[in-house]
C-alpha cells in the first residue's frame, strides 16, 4: 500500500451535501453536476436521476438521501473526487438530512431566487452549522423572470448570518453557473483529514437489503482503510463479518479495491439478518479495533402512530419481514406487534409525520406486494394514573377508563410559519382555530413575517398543512419542533357498530369538540360503510354515554312476490319471519368495514364539525 499515493488521493476528495427547502431545486442541480462532469452519458440522463425510488419519481420529491461519486477535472489541472449526497427537503425527512450531513465536510445551501429563505432552509442550515460544515450559499432558478438574487443574499446574511456576497448564482434548469459552482466546491470545501494508518473507523449512514448480497451498508470511512477479505466488527452489536465487496455509487455501483479515510461508498459482508446492523453504528477492524465508536446519530422519536394490518391475516409474518427490511433503509420507522379485536394481528407503527406514513405504506405495497389496512394516525399521549405512574398511550383504544387516571397530557409543538404579509390574518385565524397559543411575530423584511404559535401536535398532523397552503395560496412554509407535554381536557370516543366497540375506530378528542366530532364520525361512517343484509347501528360513546348515532338501513328482499294480493295473513307472516331473520343476522352478522372508514377521522375538518 503506497501511503503517499493514498494521501495525495485523499487531498483531492470533496464530500458535500445539498440542502434546501422542498422544491428549491436540489435534485436538478445534482443532475447538472452529473451531466457536466460526464458521470452519466446523455443517453442515461433523466430528470431527478438520484431519485431512484419509483415513489420519488411518481411524487416528484426526494425521500431518501442518495450518494454519488463524481470525478471533476478542475481548472488547476488536477482531478478531484466529489462525493455528492442529495437530501430531502420535506420536514418529515429531516432525519435523512442529519444523517447525510454527518458524512460530509461541506454543504451547498440552495435557495430559490424567486422565494428566498424558507422554513426548511433555516432548519437544514442549522443542522449543517451544528455539524461544523463549510456552507456554500447557492442561489438557484436565476433564469426565471421573477428571480431576485440580491434579495436572497440579503436574507441569507440577515436571517442565517452567513456571508453571501460571493454566493454562486445558478440555474439548475439551464446549467448556467454550474461550472463556477464546481470550482467553488474545490476551493471552499475542505478535504477530509482522517488518519490512513489508524485502525478502521467507519460510520454506517444508510443501508438496504439485497436478496443476493444481504445487507448493503452505505459508509463514510473516518479513519483507516477497508478492502475485501478484511474482518470487520460492528461495534454496537459486537458481531464480526468478512468483507466481500467495497465500492462507490457512480451513480450505479462500481467495485473498488479499497475504501480509504474520507471515502463515501458501500460495503457488503454477507450480513444476512437485518437485526445485525443499525444506521449510526460504527464499523471497525476485528483484528485491530479502534477504542471509541463514532458519536452516531440522535434517534428522533416518532411523531405519529398508526396501526398497520395485513388484509389477509395469514400474511402477518410477511408483513413483519417487509417492515424489518424497510426499517433497514428507513431508520426513522419504528414498529411493534399489536392485536386488534376488529382487525386481528398487526403492528403499531411510529412515523415522523403523515407524509412519512404515506410513503411507508406505498413502499410496502409497491416494493413488497403487501395489501394493507391502516388505521387513522394519532399522536402519543401521557396518562397520569391515580398511583402517580405515567402510561404512554400511542393507540387511542388503550386509554384507560376515566376513573383510572388523574389527567391526560398531549404533545405540544412550537410551530413557525413563514408567510407573506398579506396572509398573516388567515394564518393567525387558522392557528387559533386549531387551539394554538400566539407566541410572537417577527417581520423578516418588508414582505414576509415569521409567525410563532404553541400548538397541540394532534392539530398539526391531520390537515393543518393542507389548510395552511390553501389559506395562503401556497406561499406559507412550516417548521415545527416538540416542546413538551401539557395536561388537556381530553376524552376517548369509542365507535360502536351494532353495540360492538370497534377498537380500530376509537379516537381521542378535546372534550369541547367531542360531541361534534363523534357526530361527524358517525355521519362519515354511514357514508363509507356499504349497506348490509341487516340494519347497522353506528354509535359514538364516551364511556357508557352514547353521544351520537346513525343507522344504515338494510337491503330488503321482496319475500311477498309469490303471494296473491288477497292473502294479508300470509303476507304478514312472511314479513314477520323476514324481520326475525334480520334480527338474528344483526346479532351474529359481521359488518364489512372498508379501509376508507378507518381513515374517516382524517376527513373530519373543522367546517364539517361546525356543521357548515
Curated annotation (Swiss-Prot):
Any GO BP annotation: positive regulation of translation
Topology of the protein relative to the lipid bilayer: Peripheral membrane protein
Subcellular location field: Cell membrane
GO molecular function, one term: GTP binding
UniProt cross-references to Gene3D superfamilies, sorted A to Z: 3.30.70.240, Elongation factor 4, C-terminal domain, Elongation Factor G (Translational Gtpase), domain 3, P-loop containing nucleotide triphosphate hydrolases, Translation factors
Tagged with keyword Lipid metabolism: no
GO cellular component: plasma membrane
Annotated binding of GTP, by residue: 23-28, 140-143
SUPFAM superfamilies from the UniProt entry: EF-G C-terminal domain-like, P-loop containing nucleoside triphosphate hydrolases
CDD domains: EF4_II, EF4_III, LepA, lepA_C
Annotated S-S bridges: none
Limits of the tr-type G domain: 11-193
Recorded catalytic activity of this chain's protein: GTP + H2O = GDP + phosphate + H(+)
Annotated EC: 3.6.5.n1
Domain of life of the native organism: Bacteria
Entry-linked InterPro entries: EF-4, EFG_III/V, EFG_V-like, EFTu-like_2, LepA_C_sf, LepA_CTD, LepA_IV, P-loop_NTPase
Annotated signal sequence range: none
Keywords: Cell membrane, GTP-binding, Hydrolase, Membrane, Nucleotide-binding, Protein biosynthesis
Pfam families named in the record: EFG_C, GTP_EFTU, GTP_EFTU_D2, LepA_C
Keyword flag Membrane: yes
Family in the record: Belongs to the TRAFAC class translation factor GTPase superfamily. Classic translation factor GTPase family. LepA subfamily.
Database matches in NCBIfam families: lepA (TIGR01393), small_GTP (TIGR00231)
Free-text function comment from the UniProt entry: Required for accurate and efficient protein synthesis under certain stress conditions. May act as a fidelity factor of the translation reaction, by catalyzing a one-codon backward translocation of tRNAs on improperly translocated ribosomes. Back-translocation proceeds from a post-translocation (POST) complex to a pre-translocation (PRE) complex, thus giving elongation factor G a second chance to translocate the tRNAs correctly. Binds to ribosomes in a GTP-dependent manner.
Protein name: Elongation factor 4
Classification lineage: Bacteria, Bacillati, Bacillota, Bacilli, Lactobacillales
Originating gene: lepA
